[in-house]
Amino acid sequence: MIATYRFNATLTARPGMGDQLVDLLLTGLDEGSPGASEYCVVYLVSRSASDPDVVHVTEGWTSEEDHHRIFAGEAAQAIVARIGGLLAGESEYTDYVPVRGKADF
């Protein structure tokens, strides 16, 4: 499948809570979670090289509609609800349409 919709979030954890935030975000790959959906073709959790409490999440979806539908579900909302308590402030969100590139993990 091809990702026609991408989503990126930059989240800053409370000091020293970056590991917990990463662990929570990685549960998004568990069976029944958003990243395990057939419509999610990219789910990448990364950290800032200079600040371990800054975490980036990049997602690629088959469509914007699929992204919104899956994230409206119970599993996604449970993760989102738990994230709030780990954050130092507001997160940055960006959505975009891929043009071309490569991901080889």
Task: For each feature predicted by the language model, list its residue ranges.
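Glycine-rich beta-strand-turn "strand-cap" elements at beta-sheet edges
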Residues: M1-Y5, V42-D53, I79-F105
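A broadly tuned "polar low-complexity/structure-edge" signature
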Residues: I2, G18-Q20, G32
